[in-house]
From Swiss-Prot:
Belongs to the bacterial ribosomal protein bL34 family. The keyword Lipoprotein does not apply. Residues 1-22, 36-47 have a biased composition (Basic residues). It holds the Pfam family Ribosomal_L34. GO terms for biological process: translation. The gene is rpmH. This is Large ribosomal subunit protein bL34. HAMAP family: Ribosomal_bL34.
Amino acid sequence: MAKGKRTFQPNNRRRSRVHGFRSRMSTRAGRAIVSARRRKGRKSLTA
């Protein structure tokens, strides 16, 4: 049985477009995520 290809193909532009700060701030739910991570004291808020 073949395992199949690796599913994680790193791409910095897609990473920041999907998970970045600007995209998080563009929706209400995303702002909630960022504020929750601030409240928790995360060193890194977004990707």
